[in-house]
Amino acid sequence: MAINGNSIPAIKDNTIGPWKLGETLGLGSTGKVQLARNGSTGQEAAVKVISKAVFNTGNVSGTSIVGSTTPDALPYGIEREIIIMKLLNHPNVLRLYDVWETNTDLYLVLEYAEKGELFNLLVERGPLPEHEAIRFFRQIIIGVSYCHALGIVHRDLKPENLLLDHKYNIKIADFGMAALETEGKLLETSCGSPHYAAPEIVSGIPYQGFASDVWSCGVILFALLTGRLPFDEEDGNIRTLLLKVQKGEFEMPSDDEISREAQDLIRKILTVDPERRIKTRDILKHPLLQKYPSIRDSKSIRGLPREDTYLTPLSESNSSIDATILQNLVILWHGRDPEGIKEKLREPGANAEKTLYALLYRFKCDTQKELIKQQQVKKRQSISSVSVSPSKKVSTTPQRRRNRESLISVTSSRKKPISFNKFTASSASSSNLTTPGSSKRLSKNFSSKKKLSTIVNQSSPTPASRNKRASVINVEKNQKRASIFSTTKKNKRSSRSIKRMSLIPSMKRESVTTKLMSTYAKLAEDDDWEYIEKETKRTSSNFATLIDEIFEYEKYEQIRKEKEELERKVREAKAREELERRRRKQEEKERARKLLEKEDLKRKQEELKKQIEIDISDLEQELSKHKEEKLDGNIRSISAPMENEEKNINHLEVDIDNILRRRNFSLQTRPVSRLDPGIMFSSPTEEVSPVEPKRTENERLTTEKKILETIRRSKFLGSSFNIDKELKLSKMEYPSIIAPQRLSEERVVSDSNDGYESLILPKDGNGVSQLKDSTATTAPVSDGRLRKISEIRVPQFTRKSRHFSESNKRLSVLSMYSTKESFTNLVDILKNGNLDVNNQQSQRIPTPRSADDSEFLFETVNEEAEYTGNSSNDERLYDVGDSTIKDKSALKLNFADRFNGSNEAKQTDNLHLPILPPLNGDNELRKQNSQEGDQAHPKIKSMIPESGSSSHTEKEEENEEKEEKKPEQHKQEEDQEKREKVVDDMEPPLNKSVQKIREKNAGSQAKDHSKDHLKEHKQDKNTAIGNGSFFRKFSKSSDKTMELYAKISAKQLFNGLEKLLRGWTQYGLKNIKSHPNNLTLTGKLSSDNIFSLRSTLFEVNIYPRGKMSVVQFKKVSGSFKAVKKLVNEVENVLNKEGVLQK
């Protein structure tokens, strides 16, 4: 029995909790190490007994921690040892089972290592074979690397602190001098044995703890291979020894003694400069260790944490701080602000908070994994226990389980935790209880006096090694811990029992580990010694709470979950109440709003009603006043009849009809001619009824239909003008009148042309003929006026054709359908009566400008006069039949009409000029008899060039040459050409028209090679491009480039242009991409640019030209006009900068 200095027995029957103390394994300056055995499971352990008097005197060496000058540091070195050893969980690190205390001593229950110290093995055997020495050395390095990854430095590595278990595996022990490598500070404590100490330690300068442990491992490797130390003095002169260590002077063994790989590794480890010294992870990769591989050690290496775990512990938890671990750190730092700890965890560099967080997090994960494994083992054993023989005396009955107070089951596995259950003192002493995880050495003779270590270490107590390591599981939650061994329950004063350190004075707390006293001096001055005699207790409740929460995780986790669930329910209830309150408030607002709207609507209705009444009264007054004025006016001439307002209205309608009739007849009183395809005339045998004075409603609708058709033909509204819609609107004005008959597709010629005899012109005949003037007078029309075609007034929106002289000033849609050969001065015909056809043909006016250029539809008269010569609107206006094409579908004057309607056509013997699509939806024209026209008349040359001719190709080549030579001359025409595209799937033209010859500069001649070029050009296309059309043709312009020459280098110009174009992104440039390798820039001019240009993709290439450079602008797609504008802007900038070569 151990007796303390005050002669107060602290241990009853030589037991400490469930552990019965046995023989002493070693003695040290701070205490001794005793062998212990669990009374219930038979598990062996080494108990390190430390006197509390050491803490009061402050003689514990190595108690200084890095950063201990800060208020956040842990107060005692022994606390550091408890926390670190409890949290470390590695096969090559000695395990701490539990901690107990009395009023005089502190008991650390450690893992028991049967084979003792490595030092004893070296003394007995001497130098070890290289493969065996490397096996020990590798396990040492793995354990040290594990500690370093968690920011822990041992600082006292030597063979005396390296223990061996029953399988001769290394167990690193004695963390009494361990320190946290934190806050980036250097350790300043000179500790460790001088033979194994690093040069920076013996020199007394601040040192890096990681490097010093590596030096100690190098000395141990030297001793394992040679059986001696590299730094030693036979005479024991410490001063000479320290000088050798400072200089790193030692004698390297020869090749006969150790291998070259071993020499290389020792040389790299025993390097004086700690910065150049090899690291632990690099040692594991050294050829010497790779020379002797081990499967078990390889698994341990793979399970090592990251080297910088202590620097970035949050990376393992997804950068979110665990609330449980944070609360533990708050307790560990004695109620420190959690926000301050969070800032420490997130700031760069190493600190104590990060190290302990990493340790706590790994311990929590390992505990959860082991708990799951143990539960699975229990399930399997519960199933297998059914088949156990009744003769086996295993106390597993429920009655005996209810009587237990503290049964500890230590598993044989080093990682399986200890199980704590309740049991009574009598049952503990009488029952032979075993659990599934109990040790296999239950039959070991505990009374044996066999010593496991004959070497006494005077510097520090060396605990014996454990057989198996165990970790902690939770205690039953609804039971309170009582005295473990008690002789009687009535006499508590004489019991002298030992309480667990986790107990608080209320005896409602329980723990599976211990906490040392926070203020031992206060206990020494306490007068209530009876209380101290009666029981030992924990005095640092904060630290006790920390230990309980860490190592009884499941119990406190359940409490936390219940608390969180309660808080969640409270929050949900509050949220529901708040939601209900908001809903009621919203409903009240909605009701108030509806009430206000209802009142406002009622008020507005009343105001509107009053206003209507006022307006009605005003109108009545005005009406009465108007009647009075009318009566006053009639008084002057009583005999005169009163004016009939209805009659005036009828007169007005008649005048409107006359105007419409005049316009309609102006289109039909012209002589029979092929100039105007809009005029349809019947055969000579048809008789036309005269116009009645009063037109019916159907005739009025017919007239409106013809007017709308003429407007559409004028190309002013085009296909966008919906004629049927307009007719429907006109019919709505007269809903009672319904047209009884369908309008005729052919137009009826009025009797104003009765003086002439209508001629049926052949299909290919010229649009001129000698007129017969038998009467020389025209018939009167219904309104009594004479009608002539010269009296027609055509609106100015139509274009002016330059094929006619200034004298007649013919501004009519007819000119768009005319040809040079078919031109006839109709005014002269009407005035002179006859006109010689041959003379007329000989007097045709040549085309002053090419009809191959484009022209917009909606231009003013002046603009048309300026650009009509180059306009492409003089192209094919209508097609004349060809002998090779007979059954073509009707011509569709509108571009969109070509793709609509049926292709059926009626056969007729008479030739009718082309007409627009009729209003009844039939979009085809009558087919024409081509054979008769081919024999009677030659083909008429059209004003539109044929798309397949070689002359057309010449025009395109000439236009491209003009664009290159004079880019600013035809700027508008180029922009239009860029916008035009070819519709490949258009229907073929009805008739092939003769090419229109362009004469420029007094007779330029067509080139022969252009025809060859045309043939090659045709082969590259799938469909014909030049389909005859009333509209302009769309063609895709070829890619063209423009170049500028600069005086600077290509690279400098490339950088300048890249910055310039990127600076213009706010003005419409987008997607500027640079390719420095080939000096190319690409980009896009968006449609919303400041110049209102089309969206265009362009490419800029820069080529070196000696010391100068050439920049080439290329249009990828879009408008070449936009590219030209961009080139002009870039040219202006380069000219201002003075880098443009002129």
Swiss-Prot record:
Assembly description: Component of the GIN4 complex composed of at least BNI5, CDC3, CDC10, CDC11, CDC12, GIN4, NAP1 and SHS1 which forms a ring at the bud neck.
Protein's UniProt name: Serine/threonine-protein kinase GIN4
PROSITE patterns with a match to the protein in the record: PROTEIN_KINASE_ATP (PS00107), PROTEIN_KINASE_DOM (PS50011), PROTEIN_KINASE_ST (PS00108)
SMART domains (UniProt xref): S_TKc
Gene Ontology biological-process annotations: budding cell bud growth; G2/M transition of mitotic cell cycle; mitotic morphogenesis checkpoint signaling; regulation of protein localization to cell division site; septin ring assembly; septum digestion after cytokinesis
Phosphothreonine PTM positions: 884
UniProt EC number: 2.7.11.1
Organism: Saccharomyces cerevisiae (strain ATCC 204508 / S288c) (Baker's yeast)
Sequence ranges of Basic residues compositional bias: 441-452
Molecular function per GO: ATP binding; protein kinase activity; protein serine kinase activity; protein serine/threonine kinase activity
Record-listed Phosphoserine modification sites: 406, 465, 471, 617, 689, 719, 805, 807, 883, 930
Note from the entry: Present with 736 molecules/cell in log phase SD medium.
